[in-house]
Amino acid sequence: MAEEHFDVLTKSGEKTGVSKPRGEVHRDGDYHRAVHVWIFVETTQQLLLQLRSDDKDSWPGQWDISSAGHISAGDTSLLSAQRELEEELGVKLPKDAFEKIFVFLQECVTNDGKFINNEFNDVYLVTILHPIPLEAFTLQKEEVSAVKYVPYEEYRNFLSKEDPAYVPYDVNGEYGKLFDIIRQRCQVNTEARSLSLQKQLQRYSPVTLEAKLTELSEADQKALGLIVKAAKIMDDIFYEQVWNSNPALRDWLKDHANASKLDKLKWDYFTINKSPWSSLDENEAFLSTADSAVKLLPGATKAIAGWKGLEYRAAFPVTKPPGANFYPPDMDKMEFTLWLNGLTEEQKHAATGFFSVIKRRSEANLDASDHLASSTKKLPDSNSDLYSIPYSEIYRPFLKKASEFLQKAGDLVSSPSLKKLLHSKAEAFLSNEYYESDIAWMDLDSKLDITIGPYETYEDEIFGYKATFETFIGIRDDKATADLKLFGDNLKLLEDNLPLESVYKSTDVSAAPIRVIQLIYNSGDVKGPQTVAYNLPNDEKIVKDRGTSMVMLKNVQEAKFEHILKPIAEITISKEQRGLVDFDSFFTHTICHECCHGIGPHTITLPGGQTSTVRKELQEVHSAMEEAKADIVGLWALKFLITKGLLSKSMVESMYVSFLAGCFRSIRFGLTEAHGKGQALQFNYLYEKGAFVFHEDSTFSVDFAKIEGAVESLSHEILTIQGKGDKNAATLLLNKYCTITGPLKTALENLERVKVPVDISPTFPLAEALMN
């Protein structure tokens, strides 16, 4: 039998591209990777230990980790963890049982210098409810002599005293994290945790959003009920897109919401964030795997009479995965890039496109999702472990049902353009071709306004490629829509006059239609802070061919102005300028923000002559840069339109002061969120230029003599970076300015002290009633 080979790593853990036999790796002291799997019993607070065989090369006859093993060359971490547990103990678990809690570097020499172990260990925790009966294990005798359960604190004491019966681990060093994590979950102060969740919830002001349906026919109202049902399915898909165990966590929290006050708070805050990670706390986890769903797995071990089987907690990582559920969690950029280089142009387009998920062949049988398993039966031939699956396949059970609802709704509605949108979107869900349905969305001219499908890419923090599903349903405000025609009509004029070298300007900008709606329902990727407007589609081909359209959510903006911006201005804006903060300026800048998503560089030419897009070149920093661009260029655009006599001069001062107040609103979303990050960049840049002034009473004002030049300067810098596709320059700019500076910290602390809400949490009773 050939000797097992390992991937040789650098001292920092990256693959070198070299693999060597196991014996040579330990002889030469090469860095390599392994997995540690700990089984923790929740009810007894015990860890499962294995007794290493007397024939082992290292630490023979000593008690050790539940299961451990090397990652063979070409294998993945998760697959290795699952395989080692099954081979050594006879325990077979799906991937959602494994929680990767940290990576531990072990550097030691044993056997008189003959065995050098330089090993990066991916440490996994498997949480089970009750002990597995000892007779249910199937031990691999050449590796494991016995197993036993030990209380975790008792085991920690053995290790700290360097008891010779146990394989040594430095519990006062990095490996102490294991025991810290378990202790935090076991020693919960229910009252303190409830108070913490209450404070987090209080940052959202509850609002009810409705609109009059009197102008909709009876058939349109019936269709609306079907559309809301389709929108509910967008929620189901989005939960899946966030993380593989997220749907199970949602169902578990909902089912147990009435068990206690704490359980109700968990559910309430989860429904706002749609995940265990808090949007307003830079995605810090407010739940742990200990709060997650319990799953019964009767076939995980040998069957034992009288024992129903293994029950485990569906795991999720403490740190929000940057690739969400779009990529394998252990995939890095280098692996993706190497795979991409071996694909045809058509395959590359699919892999980097909006509407596909990247998976591993080696983990196909580990996926806990039934619908995914059916999608992996016909894997395309390739030497790579990675492959892509279109949304229309991986989410087919969801999309098939949503498609049926939209098809029926389209049959009912009276508006020809809405009928076309609903029918084309129903087809797109099943074909994965969204171009025609997005054109139909841009051409929509209906009292009932619908946006549904995969659009935004904020959740993909690795590349910014993959789109999440969302829905916005509203009733068009015809008067407000007519009032805003000015902005769409002047989009080309704005593009031609951007503070940007002509070589980077777009030559084919068309007027962007603007629709103003009263929102009556949203779903999918609408977690945390609520959007007040959106500019779609994001597909560069459509932007190039047709431009974009924007939708303004007027009742959402009014709610935010009343509940958030006015109270913020009272605290942060100087007394002399406070009265300049008004809704019209806030609303008008939001319009310009969305308009400016449609101008500036999108499809670009690189120095080597290749055609690309800003999104693909800037990758994970694109979202923050694009939001900053839309904000600051939007402010520039307002002043430009005023100078041209197209807007009233009376709003010059109010638009700048309202923008300043709005900075504090957005930065409170956190610096991991694209809008908050983009706003911090703008605030700190303008403050550095003297355009914003900080006073002794901890309030701010605008220096009207400096603000116009500073806005134009920042607009030029961001637009130029986008025009060049210069990711390095974008990263440097964000790193310099996306910080909480002293004055900014003071303002945020003052807002926290008086408990001004950070955002709103809407409910939609009208839409819910229609659906039911």
UniProtKB/Swiss-Prot annotation:
Pfam families (alphabetical): NUDIX, Peptidase_M49
Motif (Nudix box): 69-90
UniProt EC number: 3.6.1.-
Domain Nudix hydrolase: 30-172
Binding, Mg(2+): 84, 88
Tissue: Expressed in roots, stems and, at lower level, leaves.
Keywords from the UniProt entry: Hydrolase, Magnesium, Manganese, Metal-binding
InterPro entries recorded: NUDIX_hydrolase-like_dom_sf (IPR015797), NUDIX_hydrolase_dom (IPR000086), Peptidase_M49 (IPR039461)
Region (Disordered): 1-25
Keyword Hydrolase: yes
Family annotation (CDD domains): NUDIX_Hydrolase (cd04692)
Necessary cofactors: Mg(2+); Mn(2+)
UniProt GO molecular function: dipeptidyl-peptidase activity; metal ion binding; phosphatase activity
GO cellular component: cytosol; mitochondrion; plant-type vacuole
Compositional bias (Basic and acidic residues): 1-14
Role description: Probably mediates the hydrolysis of some nucleoside diphosphate derivatives.
Family statement drawn from the similarity comment of this UniProt entry: Belongs to the Nudix hydrolase family.
Protein name, per record: Nudix hydrolase 3
Organism in which the protein naturally occurs: Arabidopsis thaliana (Mouse-ear cress)
